[in-house]
């Protein structure tokens, strides 16, 4: 436990990670740009509300402007910020990462593509995360996913199973279950496909995950977005990695069959947690930018690169822009707008 660890971006996911590693006895600091959250953690520690328990961690929290006061560089940086903040945060933390240190983007999207060139690919380890949480009150995080159900997939960008990967596995087991993969980009693409189905679409519709089957036409929209995303991934030559407890056999069928299986599996998981709100919906409620551009928007950009049409994903991006601009509110009425844009 002698490794120095920074959790960079301590919103909902970062707060959960930072609390667990602190409670496990690691040398860890939490860094964030939300002043009230940092001040609350400095004064009272961090409260983590689980479905059946409440935990407290006496964390070490720092404002971004205080990082320059830290005396030693970090062995490990767990970047848990929004995807659209990845580039500048990677530049920001680069001087504070040891030459032989490692940065792990514990985020949605394909962040390694733009983080690795900044810090060096040899210092980047890929990660896929399955953990739902939200934070609206400074110093208090609602963790929706219990430890035994949370999951992290870790992998070297070159596909190797290395000693540092084993070390990260041991560390992250304090937060949830961990798997090591030799196909981390395939796993990240699977998560991107699922995110393109769920986060943006359900966010603009103002729906929780379990409500996806309650409104006619919504599940079909999700499957349409996911099918486009998987077609893009396959056109670009990625081998999709099974996650969410699915097997290789579940991913062996046609693109549409695989996406339907993935969508139904995730929605079924959502029915077990009716208080869970997707991160895009949380962002709308907070009045801030969503990650939809880094998810569905990335699918649209990659689709152009692969010559694969992505009208459903493009529609989600457009409605997200309209909501962020104040032209409309998230809600079920946006389904008609999405269908109009898709044509």
Task: List the predicted regions and their residue ranges.
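NAD(P)+-binding Rossmann beta1-loop-alpha1 motif at the extreme N-terminus of oxidoreductases
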Residues: 1-53
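Conserved SAM-binding loop
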Residues: 30, 78, 105
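Rossmann-like NAD(P)-binding element
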Residues: 57-97
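Rossmann-fold dinucleotide-binding core
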Residues: 72, 106, 110-197, 202-205
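NAD(P)-dependent Rossmann-like dehydrogenase/reductase catalytic/cofactor-binding core
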Residues: 2, 223-343
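A short helix->loop->beta-strand "cap" motif at the edges of active sites that frequently abuts
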Residues: 98-102, 122
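Active-site-proximal catalytic alpha-helix in oxidoreductases
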Residues: 185-213, 217-231
